[in-house]
Each structure stands twice: as C-alpha cells, then as structure tokens.
Amino acid sequence: KGKQMVLITTANFRSGGKSSIARLLAEKLNTTILNFDKKRDSEAYNVVSTINIPENKSIERKEDCLILRDKTTEQTIKTKSNYLICDLGGYFDERLVDLKSDFYIIPSFDDYESISESMRTAHYILKNNIKAKIIFVLNGAFIVDKTTKDEKIKEFQEHIEVNGFNRFTTLFLPKTALMRKLVDENTKKDDLKGKFEQNIKYKNVDKFVDELIKLII
C-alpha cells in the first residue's frame, strides 16, 4: 500500500506570488504542480513537472493519489515523493473544497488589497475545512528597505490578529530577482546557482523555502 499523500495548495483570490512559491516548493520536494489557473499554460513554461487540470474533470482524493475523471477517461496522479502541490488561479476552484488539502499556503503582497484578499481566502478555506492548516506568506517583492519591511510585517500581523489567525504561522519572502530568472531562463533554482555566483543573494530564498518545508514535513 502506498504512503499517504500530502496535498499542499497555494491560494489567494488576488495575486501574491502563488506560482513562484509553488515552483520553489515543488523543486525542493521533488514533486509535481497541478495548475488550476486556466489562463496560464504552466505546463508549457514550468521546468518543474506540471500538469494543467482541465475544468471538465472531476477530482477524487484517495489516500495515496488523486484520480482525475471525465466521461471517458480516468487518470491517476501519484508522486514518488508523496507530495502534491495545487496551484490555484485567482479564484478558489470548487473541486478543491472536497479535497481538503493538508496545507494551504496563502501568499500576499504588501498592499492593502492583496492582504485583505488573503484574509478573505483564509476565511473561505476555514469555512469549508475547519481543521485547515494555513501558512501565510508576506511576499516582499515590492519592499525595498528594512524600515518599510518592518512596518509592513507589523501591518500584516495586525491583519492576522484582527482576523483571529494568530494560531497560524506567517513567513516573510524577501524581494528577489530569482523568480523572474526561473521563468526567463526556463530553469530550476539549483541550476541557476552555479551559473551566476549569486548564492549569497539566494540564501534568503533558500532560508524561506527551508522554513516552509519544516512546517510541512
């Protein structure tokens, strides 16, 4: 019998860097991304193994795999690592409600709207899955200096408290050119490291990914 599968979903009704985080995580966990964003053909440009999930398929979760079905075919999705990552578009796919992910990662940029939407996303998830384990990520893509960073983290924490989400962990993802490069060069993070002597620059991202993994494993 297969090992139990761990399902991880990146979600936010607005943008917050969901796909970038999904990619970093998939690379580190050596697993596959299920892309639910119908506007993006991630299969085409993700180097990390990615499967686009068509709208017309139903999804059923078994202990060690997911089963995709339409009228004529059935497809089993199973990974060697036993981890599977669902990357959502800008809405919460109804099919994911029943799947009850083991972890939900909700990334947010630092602007008011993005933060509000990430809180709304968390409420929505908890309404359907009261035991949901949520990890908030404040994405510092637009934060340029330490003072702003400290202010923004404080602001974000205030939102967390007001919404009663203190029991969940919040991680900070530092600003990095890495995400852009991963797409432009169509490569993986670890392959990039050798190419540019920028280990130091990416150390913060490594640290972020390691912290994220510790919460999941």
Task: Tell what function each PLM region has.
Residues 3-29:
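Walker A (P-loop) phosphate-binding motif
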Residues 11, 34-35, 84-87, 104-109, ...:
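Conserved beta-strand segments of the P-loop GTPase G domain that flank and frequently precede/overlap
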Residues 29-45:
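Short beta-strand-centered segment that lines the nucleotide-binding/catalytic pocket of NTP-utilizing
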Residues 77-97:
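Switch II (G3) loop of P-loop NTPases
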Residues 92-112:
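Inter-motif core of Ras-like GTPase G domains
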Residues 115-140:
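Conserved C-terminal guanine-recognition region of P-loop GTPase G domains, centered on the G4
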Residues 147-194:
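Beta-strand-loop-alpha "switch" segments that mediate conformational coupling across diverse proteins
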Residues 188-217:
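NTP-binding/hydrolysis catalytic cores, primarily Walker-type P-loop NTPases
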